[in-house]
Amino acid sequence: MPDFPPKPSVKADIAIIGGSGLYDPGVLENAKEYKIYTPYGEPSDYIIVGELGGKRVAFLPRHGRGHRIPPHKINYRANIWALKMLGVKWVIAVSAVGSLREDYKPGDIVVPDQFIDMTKSRVYTFFDEGIVAHVSMADPFCEHLRQEIISTARELGYRVHPRGTYICIEGPRFSTRAESRVWREVFKADIIGMTLVPEVNLACEAQLCYATIALVTDYDVWAERPVTAEEVARVMKENTEKAKKILYKLIPRLPPEPDKARCSCCSSLETALL
């Protein structure tokens, strides 16, 4: 078993995991940086802890500031473990994704309810030595948190899709045209990205309420239409501002503790351990 470092003295109720384009939350007051050590190594970056709407909030840029860590090299276990050490109950992940559907347009927000894992070489569990756990992933996202995100995005007037299947590929390369057509036509996935897995299953093992704000930047290559870097950069900038506004409005309304009547995230291990 790995050595367990002492728990940090700082605490947080809610965590934001920032994806491509969101390297600084920009909404936290009295923010300070903390270096957190975990038995699985170091997280992607220093964790920023501050306040928003009376809540203690932790922010972690998934790729590190400056986008220096590719998807397949992210230390997902260290990231999730560090948030657990801080006492986090809620995890709001933000991700840039490509669209596999005509009606999921660049600039739209998707709050996925399912995923398909097409990654190949990542570490998927905390339970790989001495203890075996089989967590249920039938409904992989916290439904309570999903509904809060959806209602907040709608209140702000954004185009939001309340359901969607996220297919997670290994990266860092993008799909071929043939692969993209398979994801769309055979697997019936709606959006595509590179970072959801194993983040989502590790959050489940850590008994955290986890949901994703997926921000559509462009159509994947199935669409066979030209996409310029300029256009993607413009949409990503707009999406980042949308994400910040959602977080600013959403976080103050989350209760300190998840409602066990509305979600089972915090008891995911009760039926998982053998």
UniProtKB/Swiss-Prot annotation:
InterPro entries: MTAP, Nucleoside_phosphorylase_d, Nucleoside_phosphorylase_sf, Purine_phosphorylase-2_CS. The keyword tRNA processing does not apply. HAMAP family: MTAP (MF_01963). Its EC number is 2.4.2.28. Keywords: Glycosyltransferase, Purine salvage, Transferase. It comes from the Archaea. Belongs to the PNP/MTAP phosphorylase family. MTAP subfamily. Pathway: Amino-acid biosynthesis; L-methionine biosynthesis via salvage pathway; S-methyl-5-thio-alpha-D-ribose 1-phosphate from S-methyl-5'-thioadenosine (phosphorylase route): step 1/1. Catalyzes the reversible phosphorylation of S-methyl-5'-thioadenosine (MTA) to adenine and 5-methylthioribose-1-phosphate. Involved in the breakdown of MTA, a major by-product of polyamine biosynthesis. Responsible for the first step in the methionine salvage pathway after MTA has been generated from S-adenosylmethionine. Has broad substrate specificity with 6-aminopurine nucleosides as preferred substrates. It holds the Pfam family PNP_UDP_1. The keyword Transferase applies. The lineage of its organism: Archaea, Thermoproteota, Thermoprotei, Desulfurococcales, Pyrodictiaceae. Substrate binds at M194, D218, Y219, D220. Homohexamer. Dimer of a homotrimer. One of its GO terms (cellular component) is cytosol. Coiled coil: none annotated. This is S-methyl-5'-thioadenosine phosphorylase.
